[in-house]
């Protein structure tokens, strides 16, 4: 026996008589060539090749639907409950969003001066920070009337920043409306109701903004860069640097990237659940329980993708979704700081917003 080669007894040589019949010559030759390649390979190389074969087999199995190994009955029940909660609490046409405040508008679409004055004196430094935060991103709002008329609000051309104050009451109304929907969404979920009230409050304080952004993404039109909320539509006006500069804005960049994934409704609601059941939110007591719940929703999302998405085209979709949720956590923290700075100089938050963002009077 040649040193370094596997023992002959360890290899089952093909018997040429086994391959009698049509095409037997070609099959026998291929089989013998395969054995010859194995004979000249070291033990380590043979094992490496076997591992490669096993890996390719697993990949082929992953490329097909899981069938019987798909979503468990428990996972299907979880997803059904989330879908029902979403349907009951998310007004996708915004038909129930009424009696909201609007900034000064005009039907001609001309620019309308902001209604508030820029703070001066000792508040100048604070206002400078607010202007740096927000003035490069000017929100445009359009309202379609039932009679077909259109009212436009466009920010001023100058950079005084006063137009931000003009829009704040409306944004507070929209945010409060969306926040109520998220709270009701959580209350429908049985696992959420089973948690202590203190943990429910802590989870909602941490996740409400994030869940709102996930819901807003479902009405985001990536072709026009517009959030289409029934009769209302919102967009960000191009800054001096143009559209490319606009894409550097974290929230807008997030919405474009998430929309590009073309998620199913089930994937959106599972993302909402994963965000809601985050065990590391401040004030959460039963962290291990919440952590286990989050893991169950994450596993359900992973299995759902494997069952309903063609592989390997979407083999990394689950990882991309989890990365988007991490990015959303960062945006949430930045948004909270900006909101607190504006609230400090120009109080506008509704009582519910004050509760969720722990804003105290004075």
Protein language model features and the residues they cover:
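Intrinsically disordered, low-complexity regulatory regions enriched in Ser/Pro/Thr/Gln
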Residues: 1-362
């Amino acid at each position: 026996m040649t040193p370094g080669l596997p023992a002959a007894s360890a290899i089952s040589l093909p018997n040429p008589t086994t391959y009698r019949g049509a095409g037997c010559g070609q099959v026998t030759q291929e089989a013998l060539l395969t054995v010859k390649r194995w004979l000249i390979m070291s033990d380590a190389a043979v094992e490496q090749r076997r591992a490669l074969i096993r890996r390719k087999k697993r990949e082929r199995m992953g490329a097909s639907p899981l069938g019987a190994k798909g979503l468990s009955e428990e996972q299907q029940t979880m997803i059904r409950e989330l879908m029902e909660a979403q349907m009951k609490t998310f007004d996708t046409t915004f038909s129930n969003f009424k009696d909201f405040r609007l900034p000064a508008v005009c039907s001609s679409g001309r620019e309308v001066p902001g209604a508030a004055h820029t703070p001066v004196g000792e508040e100048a430094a604070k206002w400078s920070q607010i202007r740096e935060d927000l003035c490069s991103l000017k929100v445009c709002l359009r309202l379609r009337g039932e009679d077909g008329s259109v009212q436009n609000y466009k920010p001023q051309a100058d950079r005084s920043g006063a137009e931000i104050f003009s829009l704040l009451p409306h944004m507070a109304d929209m945010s409060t409306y969306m926040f109520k929907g998220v709270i009701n969404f959580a209350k429908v979920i049985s696992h959420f109701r089973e948690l202590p009230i203190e943990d429910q409050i802590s989870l909602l304080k941490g996740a409400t903004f994030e869940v709102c952004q996930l819901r807003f993404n479902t009405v985001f039109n990536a072709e026009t860069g517009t959030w289409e909320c029934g009769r209302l539509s919102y967009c960000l006006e191009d800054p001096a640097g143009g559209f490319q500069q606009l894409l550097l804005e974290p929230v807008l960049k997030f919405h474009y990237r998430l929309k590009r994934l073309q998620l199913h409704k089930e994937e959106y609601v599972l993302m909402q659940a994963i965000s809601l059941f985050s065990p590391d939110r401040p004030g959460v007591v039963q962290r291990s329980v919440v952590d286990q719940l989050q893991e169950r929703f994450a596993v359900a999302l992973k299995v759902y993708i494997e069952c309903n998405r063609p592989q390997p085209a979407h083999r990394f979709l689950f990882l991309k979704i989890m990365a988007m949720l991490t990015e959303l956590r960062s945006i949430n923290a930045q948004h909270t700081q900006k909101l607190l700075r504006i609230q400090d100089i120009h109080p506008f938050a509704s009582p519910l917003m004050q509760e969720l963002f722990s804003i105290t009077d004075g």
